[in-house]
A protein has these predicted regions:
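Bacterial N-terminal signal peptides that target proteins for export
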Residues: 2-13
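Detector for Asparagine
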Residues: 11, 36, 77, 99, ...
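Residues embedded in well-ordered secondary-structure elements
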Residues: 13, 60, 83-85, 122, ...
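Hydrophobic helical h-region of N-terminal Sec-dependent signal peptides
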Residues: 14-18
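C-terminal motif of bacterial Sec signal peptides marking the signal peptidase cleavage site
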Residues: 20-23
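Low-complexity, disordered linker/stalk regions enriched in Pro/Thr/Ser/Gly
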Residues: 25-170
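Acidic, low-complexity intrinsically disordered segments
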Residues: 166-313
């Protein structure tokens, strides 16, 4: 039977062993370097700075009506790295605007994965934000993208890109803007627009939309449309068939008079004001092939008809 001295010796050795294990643990914890790249006091901290990886550059002319823009932080320390304990790429917030004074909501990669917007996504394999623009018109565009950290430190000199789209020749009848971005439950508008028309005298416009996603609240000939249409001294005559229950809008419009001339140029015809009522995502507003544009000789002059798309944040 072990003596009391043996028990004391065993207890002493166990105490020494536990102390050594504890000390090693303390040393191991102390050796871990804590990094927080969102903390300005961190040695590797960088200010928010957006780098456009792919997309139109300032001053160029696109020969396509669609474009994809991808971006990330300019500092590689903030790029996606599977060895990092914190994925900084997915936690940085971004917002953008295209030809408007209204910014998109702030979304980071985590938000975008949850929302599944379709037109704006976060690529978890590359850590890139991907934004798709469709139905771009033959006009000038200005795109801005801004970032901020979860600490609300915002980018001060964000990318501001101006580019031009030139794709089609001839008379166009289209929904403008071709891609509308709007808040869920919000009010937005589109125009039915003519581009590069010569001697315009009348038209039949047939528009369809998903009335479970949006409801037509109002329609009118806006001031710049009226200015465009009243280039001629003739009388403006219009007939409207509005069927919101079936998501259908028709307009017959003509310039009447004894010796009036046709209208030439580019301008909006009618503004359609909608309210979003459905889920988030995208839906089209289409102009049917039955729509027509006629000149003073009653010739059909429209060469291209384009729909639009509504993208809800």
């Amino acid at each position: 039977m072990p003596s009391k001295r043996s028990y004391k010796t065993i207890n002493f050795l166990l105490s020494v062993l536990l102390l050594m294990i504890y000390s090693c643990g303390q040393l191991e914890v102390a050796s871990i370097e804590i990094v927080n790249l969102f903390d300005p006091s961190d040695d590797e901290y960088s200010l928010p700075d957006t780098e456009i990886v792919e997309g139109p550059a300032s001053g160029i002319t696109l020969d396509s009506s669609s474009s994809t823009v991808t971006w990330r932080h300019s500092d590689p320390n903030y790029h996606y790295d599977p060895t990092h304990e914190v994925d900084y790429a997915e936690r940085i917030y971004y917002r953008y605007r295209l030809n408007t004074a209204t910014w998109s909501p702030w979304y980071n990669g985590i938000n975008l994965i949850e929302r599944q917007l379709g037109f704006w996504a976060f690529d978890t394999l590359s850590g890139l934000h991907v934004l798709q623009f469709d139905y771009l018109e033959d006009i000038n565009y200005q795109l801005e993208i801004m970032s901020k950290y979860p600490t609300n430190i915002q980018e001060e000199n964000w990318p501001d890109i101006s580019f031009f789209v030139d794709v089609y020749e001839g008379t166009e009848l289209l929904i403008s803007p071709g891609q509308v971005f709007a808040d869920s439950g919000g009010i937005f508008f589109v125009n039915a627009k003519l581009i590069d028309v010569t001697d315009f005298m009348g038209m039949h416009l047939d528009v369809s939309y998903d009335n479970s996603f949006m409801q037509l609240q109002n329609y009118y000939l806006e001031s710049d449309s009226t200015d465009f249409l009243l280039q001629s001294e003739g009388q403006l005559i219009n007939f409207v068939n509005n069927d919101p229950q079936n998501g259908h809008f028709q307009l017959d419009l003509g310039v009447a008079g004894g010796s009036v001339t046709g209208i030439s140029g580019t301008g909006n015809i009618v503004r359609l004001v909608f309210e979003h009522i459905g889920e988030i995502g995208q839906r089209s507003i289409t102009i049917s092939s039955e729509s027509s544009v006629r000149d003073v000789y009653n010739n059909s002059v429209v060469e291209h008809i384009f729909p639009g798309v509504v993208s809800i944040w």
